[in-house]
């Protein structure tokens, strides 16, 4: 039996939409007949993303937006409403991952400060920018991108994990306050090398926390296969031993949450590779 397409004609606004999860999600939504608003702080990246996604005329627009500035987020929403008259789905995807130990505070503080503004306040800004509109139109869906780092404290992930735990709290609070009006989905991806998040890591050694007791075995595996010559069973999604996801795998699950009847809300999704070594 063919599944019904609930994504078609929905208006989807994505922050951080020019790369990673956001870009993959935008592409998949367009393929299913949605209308997309891509926002990103990088204007050149927006132009590149628009060129790379084949969309019908007037089905997609790109807007520069710094999510740390609530007025810019509100303006992006208003521009979206001018074009499409409604917003069905708000995806708060923009984020950074400045992993570092507390001992790194002198070099990490500025990155941590920005992380709080982007990962926490950016999500809050996205919520309040669409809240009144979704209430007025009678329905809507807010999708917040959290992380498995939000599940439990680990060394090196204190500030990043705290911002993502705060996202979980915002998501659940919004759900409680808007039942029957706004659907809320919280997405907790595992580590996904194909995104730009790793570029923000302050201290590369801080990734040890998420591996915990599996660190030694993981390092042995990498040392046994230098030059990224990792066996196929660890790199293909058709293998139970897959070590790491691609951004598209996460985007597929976000699409799943969007592609539901109006009365069905997928509240919380954890997406991980079946063979990943992360302890969270």
Whereabouts are the PLM-identified features?
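Conserved glycine-rich Rossmann-like NAD(P)H-binding loop of the short-chain dehydrogenase/reductase
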Residues: 32-49
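The beta1-alpha1 cofactor-binding region of Rossmann-like NAD(H)/NADP(H)-dependent oxidoreductases
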Residues: 43-44, 64-76, 109
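Active-site helix of classical SDR
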Residues: 127, 163
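Residue(s) in the substrate-gating loop at a strand-loop-helix junction
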Residues: 147
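SDR active-site lid
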Residues: 176-264
């Amino acid at each position: 039996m063919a599944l019904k397409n609930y994504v078609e004609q929905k208006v989807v606004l994505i922050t951080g939409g020019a790369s990673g999860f956001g870009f993959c999600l935008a592409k998949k939504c367009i393929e299913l007949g949605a209308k997309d608003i891509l926002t990103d702080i990088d204007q050149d990246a927006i132009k590149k993303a628009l060129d790379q996604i084949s969309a019908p005329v007037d089905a997609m627009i790109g807007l520069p937006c710094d999510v740390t500035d609530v007025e810019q987020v509100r303006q992006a929403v208003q521009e979206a409403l001018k074009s499409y008259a409604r917003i069905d789905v708000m995806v708060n995807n923009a984020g950074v991952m400045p992993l570092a130990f507390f001992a790194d505070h002198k070099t990490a503080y500025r990155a941590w400060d920005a992380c709080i503004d982007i990962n926490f306040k950016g999500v809050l800004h996205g919520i309040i920018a669409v809240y009144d509109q979704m209430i007025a139109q009678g329905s809507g869906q807010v999708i917040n991108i959290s992380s498995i780092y939000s599940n439990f404290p680990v060394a090196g992930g204190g500030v990043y994990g705290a911002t993502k735990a705060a996202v979980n709290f915002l998501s659940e609070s919004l759900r409680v306050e808007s039942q029957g009006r706004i659907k809320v989905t919280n997405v907790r991806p595992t580590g996904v090398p194909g995104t730009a998040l790793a570029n923000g890591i302050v201290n590369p050694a801080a990734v040890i926390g998420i591996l915990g007791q599996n660190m030694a075995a993981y390092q042995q595996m990498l040392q046994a296969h230098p030059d990224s010559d990792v066996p196929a069973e660890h790199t293909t999604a058709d293998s139970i031993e897959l070590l790491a996801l691609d951004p598209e795998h996460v985007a597929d699950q976000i699409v799943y949450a969007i592609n539901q009847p109006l009365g069905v809300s997928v509240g919380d999704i954890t997406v991980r590779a079946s063979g990943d070594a992360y302890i969270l």
